[in-house]
């Protein structure tokens, strides 16, 4: 396993291009590093190898953070639903398995990997999703960081799979 620490100010496009010379013709993994989960890496890689496409991203259901309102034409509240998994969107969890050919989708300095390259791969039928139904949590805010630190300190960190037997 090789890790590339590219700095917090570098965009993902530059991060990927910087490691290209180390990848060669090998399948590689990439993560954004701003989230934690208990995804089974071996199963993720196995899924990727079985379908034979250029890219696999890990997909999770992001639960709504707030209650949901159904509002009528006259602005009256027709229904109110508390947050529910069913109200969530399926999102990219940031854990990917990629083939070296994905470097060909990164064309220039203004290429944002999550936009043009992933859209191009999807349009060409070369992007698959591995749906993860276990624990996943982003760490984009101080609140999320604090929550994850409390989980870790309490010994209830579902992502700590290396200590599970």
Give the role of each language-model region.
Residues 1-7, 11-12:
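Single conserved hydrophobic/aromatic residue that forms the stacking wall/gate
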Residues 4, 22, 121:
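Conserved catalytic core of Hanks-type protein kinase domains
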Residues 8, 32-35:
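Short acidic donor-binding/metal-coordinating loop in glycosyltransferase active sites
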Residues 16-27:
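Active-site nucleotide-sugar/metal-binding loop of Leloir-type enzymes
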Residues 27-29, 36, 42-49, 62-64, ...:
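Catalytic-core segments of class I nucleotidyltransferases/pyrophosphorylases
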Residues 51-61:
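A short, conserved acidic/glycine-rich loop-to-beta-strand motif
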Residues 72:
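Extended acidic/charged loop-beta regions that coordinate divalent cations
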């Amino acid at each position: 396993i090789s890790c590339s620490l590219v700095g917090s100010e570098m965009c993902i496009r530059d991060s990927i291009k910087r490691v290209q010379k180390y990848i060669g013709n090998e399948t590689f993994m990439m993560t954004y590093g701003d989230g934690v989960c208990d995804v089974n890496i071996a199963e993720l890689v196995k899924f990727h190898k079985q379908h034979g496409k250029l890219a696999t991203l890990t997909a999770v259901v992001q639960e709504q953070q707030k209650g949901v309102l159904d509002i009528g034409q006259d602005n009256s509240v027709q229904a109110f639903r508390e947050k529910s998994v069913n109200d969530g969107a399926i999102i990219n969890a940031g854990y990917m398995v990629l083939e070296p050919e994905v470097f060909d989708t990164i064309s220039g300095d203004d290429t944002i990997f999550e936009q043009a390259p992933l859209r191009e791969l999807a349009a060409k039928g070369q992007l698959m999703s591995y749906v993860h139904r276990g624990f996943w949590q982003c760490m984009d805010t101080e609140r999320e960081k604090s929550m994850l630190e409390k989980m870790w300190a309490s010994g209830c960190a579902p992502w700590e799979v290396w200590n599970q037997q």
